[in-house]
Amino acid sequence: MTETKVSEFQLKGKYGKYGGQYVPEVLMPALEELDVGYEKYKNDPESLAELDHYLRDFAGRETPLYFARNLSKKYGTKVYLKREDLVHGGAHKLNNALGQALLAKFMGKTRLIAETGAGQHGTATAMVGATLGFETIVYMGAKDIKRQQMNAYRMELMGTEVRAVETGSKTLKDAINEAMRDWVTNIENTHYLIGSVVGPHPYPMIVRDFQSVIGKEVKEQAMEKEGRLPDSIIACAGGGSNAMGTFHPFIEDREVKLIAVEAGGKGLKCTEKAALHSASLCIGEEGILHGARTKILQDKNGQILESESVSAGLDYSGVGPELAYLSESGRVTARYVTDDEALDAFNELSRLEGIIPALESSHALAYLKKAAESGELGEFVVVNLSGRGDKDLETVLSLRRGV
């Protein structure tokens, strides 16, 4: 009975050939407990009402769908920005952090652990940990702490312990590894609050569901403002949580083009041990990373390549399995932009609209700039502005100074 049940459970997390659960046996009971707990949680009216309360009164939802008049004039198409930068904390990450923290409380957990790259997910986890009374620990690569010191301090200010990861490339990939090691040791009282649509089932599904509030709002707001759905929706993609959250409510609306923009870094080249980019969808290969089969950056021996991007939040060697499936099936179009193109878009939105975007979101804006000239986006485009750029000002200033 148990073997059959586990087998059926594993099949639930498949997206074509991607997804699944490639984890140590010791984690399987915890994953099944999480799957069962989530099924109960999402069908519990009181729990959903509590989530709605926190999304509205703590996170500040719904976020505006803003008509970018000056950007629209420049590119000759109606450009709307989904303002996830206005969510409490400055990014879309709080949508998922609130959902998972309330799920953890529902399941009787008392301790939260998380990984973070740019620090936005870590900050969101620190926020919910503080307001809901959890002991909270965030793992962050030492390289990312150096380029996102303000976010590391914000987490500590809210009572979270930030643990620097000194192994590997000292970035998001390594932070996930350390968080998983912690979880294996402390399964009974700990919930691992994964920040993206990555990892073993049921995490990609759970994170997607909690982030889908973005796409649901876009759908309603587009009808209110334009009387129809957008021709194109653009979102940046590292692990892919903001992209999947924006895209998922539109999957069946085939007339809407869905474009995931990856970090092209210094160009789509690889050295022996590292990629000079983070473009897993565009040129990655099938492999296993952090408990799921997906598209990853790897060498000829199957070893994970270190990724690179000016944006800490996109600096990841893989991508969520559902996004890999949607890209391969043709429903989502994968594109990339370079560091320099993203920095140009960062400056352009700041100057034209008075909105400073995160470097992650700047990748989506940079593709808007590239594609608008060809007319491929149509007359009505939505760009998900996944976060604000305050956290990136020091990075941008350092680059300008040549530091």
Curated annotation (Swiss-Prot):
UniProt GO cellular component terms: cytoplasm
GO terms for MF: tryptophan synthase activity
InterPro entries (UniProt xref):
Trp_synth_b_CS (IPR006653), Trp_synth_beta (IPR006654), Trp_synth_beta/beta-like (IPR023026), TrpB-like_PALP (IPR001926), TrpB-like_PALP_sf (IPR036052)
- Keyword tRNA processing listed: no
List cofactor names only.
Answer: pyridoxal 5'-phosphate
The alphabetized UniProt keywords are: Amino-acid biosynthesis, Aromatic amino acid biosynthesis, Lyase, Pyridoxal phosphate, Tryptophan biosynthesis
Read off the NCBIfam families from this record: trpB
**What does the subunit section of this Swiss-Prot or TrEMBL entry state?**
Tetramer of two alpha and two beta chains.
Q: What family is this?
A: Belongs to the TrpB family.
Identify this protein by name.
Tryptophan synthase beta chain 1
What organism does this protein naturally occur in?
A: Methanosarcina acetivorans (strain ATCC 35395 / DSM 2834 / JCM 12185 / C2A)
Name of the gene this protein is made from? trpB1
